[in-house]
UniProtKB/Swiss-Prot annotation:
Its main location: cytoplasm. Mg(2+) binds at residues 105, 227. One of its GO terms (molecular function) is UDP-N-acetylglucosamine diphosphorylase activity. CDD domains: GT2_GlmU_N_bac, LbH_GlmU_C. The lineage of its organism: Bacteria, Pseudomonadati, Pseudomonadota, Gammaproteobacteria, Enterobacterales. It comes from Photorhabdus laumondii subsp. laumondii (strain DSM 15139 / CIP 105565 / TT01). The gene is glmU. Residues 1-229 are annotated as: Pyrophosphorylase. This is Bifunctional protein GlmU.
């Protein structure tokens, strides 16, 4: 942001009636985070010293959702138009700073476009973001005389001739704070809507002989607002398409870019292959030669080089070292870590557990609060019984242990290295090195047994 432009105002007080939702409009998610958060992030990327958020409808929930943000909260108790919203923010302006005005429901506005807008703002004048549309219906029109911007006329107030203008107002502008205060104080609501229009400051500035410079966005999607769920879904697709394009150009192989969702940040190595319907959330790192199967969900995780995640696997807040294989239909819950070449197979769930180098849990297993050494085999149907209804307890399994199928390990329990646990065993006591442990009921054979037969009705 330029030296003089140090504050941003984000207008986010609208009700969002056409969303048909109890959730404030600006909190609806785009790419996994609230629309308004995208705008806040862009403001911060510009280096804004102050971000004033004008809020109203659903204010408590908005404050709660954004409680970790460094914002100046400005209440607009009544929604009487964009001009009225800015009047609430005006007392917070420093006289010598420029004010950039953004909107909480215009989430895709880019920092590069705003940098150009800030650069063209004339001294004492206004920098205005406009766009040329084939169909400008619904937008305020830019009125010019001899090529100079003289005002903005809203659709409902425009004449038939003015409605033919195809240069439209995006609502985004930058002006000096002291000038804005003066112009805002002169607004009236003498219009069809009975509202105070921020756009009227353009005509007021022109009357004072101030220059208004207009620039266009780099992409039209940057100025598109959201009034309903259809528009939100359209922007979601635009955003995802842009993310997919960037990944493809960076060397990630998306087998179908139209069926990939990035809802966070993806750091990747070389020769990564991602199949269809994969969702990336939070901060995810994929090493070299990683393969992600169809239908996987990865959230806040690190996947080491040469690892393969098979279809329909969920990995959250977990880490894999080099050469791991996981899935299909596996779930790694928060706190799971796989060492080099560890294997977690189908219908295996891990939580707060470590699986050592070369160890395997092939199928139908729950490993919770477990620390498992290297080269361990976990048989099908094994369960670490880690919860007594009040507290969680740890299971520790040493290197080279063989755990037979259908084993229950009742924590807290320690299985020393080299031990063997027979199938169907319930382990309730610690096991020493190289011991064989079996606990089963005696198998009984009853000759001539006849099954019960239902009586005929």
């Amino acid at each position: 942001m330029s030296n003089s432009a140090k504050s941003v105002v984000i207008l986010a007080a609208g009700k969002g009636t056409r969303m048909y939702s109890d959730l404030p409009k600006v909190l609806h998610l785009l790419a996994g985070k609230p629309m308004v958060q995208h705008v806040i992030d862009t403001a911060m990327a510009l280096g804004a010293k102050n971000v004033h958020l004008v809020y109203g409808h659903g204010g408590d929930l908005i404050e709660q959702t954004l409680s970790d943000q460094t914002l100046n909260w400005v209440l607009q108790a009544e929604q009487l138009g964009t001009g009225h919203a800015m009047q609430q923010a005006a007392p917070h302006f420093a006289g010598d700073e420029d004010i950039l005005i953004l909107y909480g429901d215009v989430p895709l506005i880019g920092a590069d476009t705003l940098e150009r807008l800030l650069a063209v703002k004339p001294e004492g004048g206004i920098g205005l973001l406009t766009a040329i549309l084939d169909n400008p219906t619904g937008y305020g029109r830019i009125v010019r005389e001899n090529g100079e911007v003289t005002g903005i006329i809203e659709q409902k107030d425009a004449t038939e001739e003015q409605r033919k203008i195809n240069e439209i107002n995006t609502g985004i502008l930058v002006a000096n704070g002291s000038d804005l205060k003066r112009w805002l104080s002169q607004l009236d609501n003498n219009n069809v809507q009975g509202e105070y229009y921020l756009t009227d400051v353009i005509a007021l500035a022109y009357k004072e002989g101030r220059k208004i410079e207009a620039v266009h966005p780099t992409r039209l999607s940057e100025m598109e607002g959201v009034n309903n769920r259809l528009q939100l879904s359209a922007l979601e697709r635009i955003y995802q398409s842009e993310q997919a394009e960037q990944l493809l150009l960076a060397g990630v192989m998306l087998l179908d870019p139209a069926r990939f969702d990035l809802r966070g940040t993806l750091i990747h190595g070389r020769d990564v292959v991602i199949d269809t319907n994969v969702i990336i959330e939070g901060n995810v790192t994929l090493g070299n030669n990683v393969q992600i199967g169809t239908g996987c969900v990865l959230k806040n995780c690190i996947i080491g080089d040469d690892s393969i995640i098979s279809p329909y696997t969920i990995v959250e807040d977990s880490e894999m070292e080099t050469g791991c294989t996981v899935g299909p239909f596996a779930r790694l819950r928060p706190g799971s870590k796989l060492a080099e070449k560890a294997h977690v197979g189908n219908f295996v769930e891990m939580k707060k557990s470590y699986l050592g180098k070369g160890s395997k849990a092939g199928h139908l297993t729950y490993l919770g609060d477990a620390d498992i050494g290297r080269d361990v085999n976990i048989g099908a149907g094994t369960i670490t019984c880690n919860y007594d209804g009040a507290n969680k307890f740890k299971t520790i399994i040493g290197d080279n242990v063989f755990v037979g199928s259908d084993t229950q390990l009742v924590a807290p329990v320690i299985v020393a290295k080299g031990a063997t646990i027979g199938a169907g065993t319930t382990v309730t006591k610690n096991i020493a090195e190289n011991e064989l442990v079996v606990s089963r009921t005696k198998q009984t054979h009853i000759q001539g047994w006849k099954r019960p037969v239902k009586e005929k009705k």
